[in-house]
Amino acid sequence: MQYQVDTHTHTVASSHAYSTIHDYIAVAKQKGIRLFANTDHGPAMADAPHFWHFVNLRVLPRMVDGVGILRGIEANIKNIDGEIDFFGDYLKQLDIVLAGFHEPVYPPSDKATHTEAMINAIKSGKVDIITHPGNPAYPIDIEAVARAAAEYGVALEINNSSFEVSRKGSEANCTAIAKAAKEFGTILVMGSDSHVAFSLGGFARAQAIIDEVAYPPSRLLNRSPSALLAFLAARGHETVADLIPLFSDDEPCC
């Protein structure tokens, strides 16, 4: 099964990634991906693009050869207050805001601190999706985070890269997150976290967890472009209004 939506990708603008927007579009066409988000690392990361990169994402076309592009960021959660490294009116220019913990910006400490920081990011209203919350380097109170995400309408990511490239040992945590999300009505999304275009839309390991816990497909954001766009619009992203009509006739893939 090929899902048509990928919310988490990195380009050469993050210098530890290896593909361009053109590369991603080419692979998207090959794989049947209809909508993907360009979410390079926030500027607090050492090799992240400059702040202006995100301000200027408006130059990206909405559609190229039938593939839609979301203008976004994977911001860094910086502290226990849940602050991120992108702010103010500039956030309103983005279609999608991901945020997560990254060691160079916010080193791991303890479960209580991680949980408070993540929940504060969720409560801030600035973050749409929490990335790789199953990272074993940052243990959290999974039930508390899932409850908060459900209450504030924020999605939690099951990050496929965590099972294949980085954050090894994430499987048990991600399974627990999926189970808690099912119980508390939390929205989930699978993210490839691609750092090279070849892995765009690669969700096999994440999908296995979704299937294992029998998470409801109706709450999975990858189910269709229109589902993701409706989620983003409901969260106040007026910028996606011009994309919504382009996917009005799509149907869930599962």
Swiss-Prot record:
Question: Mind listing the UniProt keywords for this protein, alphabetically?
Answer: Hydrolase, Metal-binding, Zinc
Identify its protein family. Belongs to the PHP family.
Question: What does the record list as GO biological process?
Answer: bacterial-type flagellum-dependent swarming motility
Species, as recorded: Shewanella baltica (strain OS195)
Q: Which principal EC class is assigned to this enzyme?
A: hydrolase
Could you confirm whether the keyword Hydrolase appears in this record? yes
**What does the entry comment about cofactor binding?**
Binds 3 Zn(2+) ions per subunit.
Q: What Gene3D superfamilies does the record tag this protein with?
A: Metal-dependent hydrolases
The record's Gene Ontology cellular component field reads: cytosol
Q: List, alphabetically, the NCBIfam families matched.
A: PRK09248.1
Record's InterPro entries?
Phosphatase_YcdX_put, PHP_dom, PHP_phosphatase, Pol/His_phosphatase_N, Pol/histidinol_Pase-like
Q: What is this protein called?
A: Probable phosphatase Sbal195_1503
The answer to keyword Hydrolase applying to this record is yes
Query: Which intervals of the chain form a coiled coil?
Result: none
EC number annotated for this UniProt entry: 3.1.3.-
Membrane-spanning segments? none
Report the GO molecular function annotations: phosphatase activity; zinc ion binding
The entry marks the following residues as binding Zn(2+) 2, namely 16, 41, 195
| Binding residues for Zn(2+) 1 | 8, 10, 74, 193
Cofactor requirements of the protein: Zn(2+)
